[in-house]
């Protein structure tokens, strides 16, 4: 609390959704309750959960829930019927789901789908064997690059592809920071930390929380005290607006929106 203010008198604003990750982790470490407005919490975002599912499967090959979540992410032509065949074969042979993927011919799966299953299986096994040899950061970055997750979002025409790209990049940054703090820690320890953060989020249901949101989401709202974070060239204003006068002017207008969310005090933060 600042000057005996309650948490709900404060708001922290940022330019892009991906910036919330560092803020959320800091708030959790300090025991500060918070709400995310206009988005979901960082580790609950679909693309982040997909990458985490890859990492969980690499740590535990028996994690069928994670396997089914990402067997066709990014899209590799493995449809629901193929997955059902794999499940049935796994139950018939009484072996783990992951094991049936190395022999798709046995399930009468051929052609591109067979190749896709083989490739997926080989990647998972490769990184499962590397999990104790590489740092969490090295493993995650190499995996994401080999699978092509960032390039998938970079090439996507979906309107939120840039946000999803940024979120995956921010997740990799989070893992790098973890590895720097814990150079001897394995990937499983990072995943335990993420699970703990999620548990803390779900446990604290108080309404007296700091509000975290993008500047766009803050339009029409006001708070006694506002922190505007990430005022660094390339982040706010965004890098791709610096050479366009109209885009740069829009960034100025957005900054004005952020400033005027504060009723009493505003703090400008930069790295």
Locate each region found by the language model.
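Accessory C-terminal helicase-associated subdomains
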Residues: 6, 74, 100-217, 221-222, ...
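C-terminal accessory regions
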Residues: 231-271
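Conserved motor-region signature of P-loop NTPase helicases/translocases
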Residues: 1-68, 155-166, 173, 185, ...
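Short Ser/Thr-interspersed hydrophobic loop/turn segments at strand-loop and sheet-helix junctions
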Residues: 217, 226-233
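Conserved RecA-like P-loop NTPase helicase motor core
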Residues: 51, 55-59, 67, 71, ...
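C-terminal helical "lid" of AAA+/P-loop NTPase domains
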Residues: 84-89
